[in-house]
Curated annotation (Swiss-Prot):
Pathway: Purine metabolism; AMP biosynthesis via salvage pathway; AMP from adenine: step 1/1. GO terms for molecular function: adenine binding; adenine phosphoribosyltransferase activity; AMP binding. It comes from Clavibacter michiganensis subsp. michiganensis (strain NCPPB 382). This is Adenine phosphoribosyltransferase. Its EC number is 2.4.2.7. It holds the Pfam family Pribosyltran. PANTHER family: ADENINE PHOSPHORIBOSYLTRANSFERASE. Homodimer.
């Protein structure tokens, strides 16, 4: 992906924290990007423009919520929350996905949009792709079309894009 003003801003603001949350992990901290108004605007504008018209924007808990709300506002559409299991009351759709040690689950309220609605799915980082793959399945099970998947940062060595084959994936910055 060619460099853009958004990718330049992300690269300049991204923090790298060694040994967090445990020894041997090189954590990429995007909070400075989200805290910078021009950077956030550039990121959201690029993610929205890459997808085309949508009916809603879904965000994966937790930082995906921030991106989804901003993108939905910029697009004049609503937002959907893909939550960690046990956080939504009432009827939910649930998808489990593998973690390095064990598994996790995410949930979505069904029936929030008309069947066939186009939804842009956003999260902060694409690593192994497990969470976004599960989130895309949730949206499809709810009867929606995943119009695109957008992230601020893709960690290419972890192979997440391959797990999302068949989806249009846009990363602002790939490392």
């Amino acid at each position: 992906m060619p460099e853009t003003p958004a990718s330049d801003l992300v690269r300049s603001l991204l923090l790298t924290v060694p040994d967090f949350p445990q020894p041997g992990i090189l954590f990429r901290d995007l909070t400075p990007v989200l805290a910078d108004g021009p950077a956030l605007r550039a990121v959201v504008d690029d993610l929205v423009a890459a997808c085309g018209p949508v009916d809603a924007v879904a965000g994966v808990e937790a930082r995906g919520f921030l991106l989804a709300a901003a993108a939905a506002y910029a697009s004049g559409v609503g937002t959907l929350a893909v939550r960690k299991a046990g956080k939504l009351p009432g009827e939910v759709l649930r998808e489990t996905y593998a973690l390095e040690y064990g598994e996790a689950a995410i949930e979505l309220h069904p029936g929030q949009l008309a069947p066939g609605s186009r939804v842009l799915l956003l999260d902060d980082v694409l690593a192994t792709g497990g969470t976004l793959e599960a989130a895309a399945r949730l949206l499809e099970r709810a009867g929606y079309e995943v119009a695109g998947i957008g992230v601020v940062l893709e960690l290419a060595d972890l192979g997440g894009r391959e797990r999302l084959a068949g989806h249009d994936v846009r990363a602002i910055l790939t490392l």
